Structure formats: C-alpha cells, structure tokens
C-alpha cells in the first residue's frame, strides 16, 4: 500500500510540475520583447505560483521541495535554447550536462525520501503551528517564492 501511495504522490507532483512548465512557457510568448533574463524570471514566478496552488490544494508545502533541483534544469534548457548564435556550443553543452546530472541526482534523492502526500517536511509542520492562520501567506512568500528567487539568482 505504501508503494501505491508513493507512486500516486509522485504522479500528482509530476502533473503539478508539468502544468507549471506549460504555464511558464506560455507566459513567455507575450513577453517576447523582454530581455531573456526578465522573461525567465516572469516564467519562474508564474511556475512557482502554480506549484504553490498545488501545495495549497493538497495541503502540503513539501510539493515545492523538488523545485530546488528542477528549476535549474529548466533554466539551463531555456538558456541553451535561447542562447545567441555565436555562443560557445561546447561550453553550453558542458554546463547543460552538469546541471542535468546534478538536478536529476538531487531530484531523485528528494523523491526517494518522500513517502507521499501525507509527509511534509518537519520544518513546515512547525511553521504551521507557530504561524497559525498566516501559514499559507508565509508559505507562499517564505517557502515558495524566496527559495525560487534564490535559485533563479543562483542560475546566473
């Protein structure tokens, strides 16, 4: 039964992240005139809002946890695709491979230890208790948006 619950939880997270990815890509089209870094910021923030909505829907902020390792992969792929024609192909390929290896390993480790939608990081449970009714606004800003901005900044 535990394996089934884990598999279901992983499918839920996968769907949330797929929707976040589609929404992030769609938001960049009307922003085509923006600088590529500004477009990735907008896409990243919108994707984070989708993941937050999934966290809220399933009452579990740990749904965000893989984002730390998935976002750099998405940004590396985006910048590889959006790179100028005169960019160093070898260097781009090396960076992409390294980010992919790192991100896949970290995502695997994150999901391996996650037992399902009933499991939430102990720190988030403590925040729930101490923040009370302010937990979800705090989760949006402190657990979702702030780490997203740090991760986005770390990709440059």
Model-inferred region functions:
Residues 1-156:
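Membrane-anchoring alpha-helices and their flanking helix-loop junctions
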